[in-house]
Amino acid sequence: MRLSAQLTNTKLADEEVPELASVPDGVSRWTGADLDRLRSAARRGGVGAEQQDLEQKLCRTIDILGARSQKTQGINAVLTSVARLRESNTFRLYLLTQNHRGVGILKMGVKKLFVTHPVTCGLVEVDPLCVLDFYVDESCQRQGYGKQLYAHMLDAEHVSRPELLAIDRPSDKLLGFMKKHYGLTAYTPQVNKFVVFHGFFGHTTVSERGKLLRTTSPTGAAAAATGTKAKNEMPG
């Protein structure tokens, strides 16, 4: 990232988060398409000043919290912004608000990954739902907001087991969060820096083309259909 962009994001991170008067406290979900609809409605006119105000302040909130996340993690590239949300229709952002101000973000999206299988030690292709960015404002940490945000996401995404998610470059703090709240610790280090817990591979088999297939049981019909050997399977 160019130095000018880094300075811009640092300045943005220091801005005060605007009040979102029309957004109820709790967790809301936003996609690039949602934000585009808000922007289009505001530009067309015919909407009240309140809606125009929401579009501007919501987008600013997302950009500020994304910049704060980048600053906290000490990384060069911003992971969450309105522009980044528009890059893929699989991206969705969970925004946590308290007292009508954004205090946390959780960005999710589907990615195609090649990861090392913990049993065969070979590369397999997976396309999991991924945690791409997770941030709670420093002033609101250790108050249960992170767990509230994560639990809401799991429910909204219909994820029955947290280990079915992949996490992009998690910090030690996030790994500690996963251990504390979900008992997840075992994973094989990956070249791409994603963390995929060993439980992700439960009830799976590997096709002849190297794609991980999920079965209903360790000896499910998918294994028979692909002709994959049972030794490539992981128990649940």
From Swiss-Prot:
Function: Specifically acetylates 'Lys-40' in alpha-tubulin on the lumenal side of microtubules. Promotes microtubule destabilization and accelerates microtubule dynamics; this activity may be independent of acetylation activity. Acetylates alpha-tubulin with a slow enzymatic rate, due to a catalytic site that is not optimized for acetyl transfer. Enters the microtubule through each end and diffuses quickly throughout the lumen of microtubules.
Keyword match Acyltransferase: yes
Pfam family of the protein (one): Acetyltransf_16
Gene3D superfamilies attached to this UniProt entry: 3.40.630.30
PANTHER family the UniProt entry points to: ALPHA-TUBULIN N-ACETYLTRANSFERASE 1
Residues under site feature: Crucial for catalytic activity: 73
Biased composition (Low complexity): 219-229
SUPFAM superfamilies cross-referenced by the UniProt entry: Acyl-CoA N-acyltransferases (Nat) (SSF55729)
Enzyme Commission numbers on file: 2.3.1.108
Binding site for acetyl-CoA: 134-147, 171-180
Protein name, entry field: Alpha-tubulin N-acetyltransferase
GO biological process, one term: regulation of microtubule cytoskeleton organization
Key words of the record: Acyltransferase, Transferase
Domain of life: Eukaryota
Ranges for region Disordered: 217-236
GO molecular function: tubulin N-acetyltransferase activity
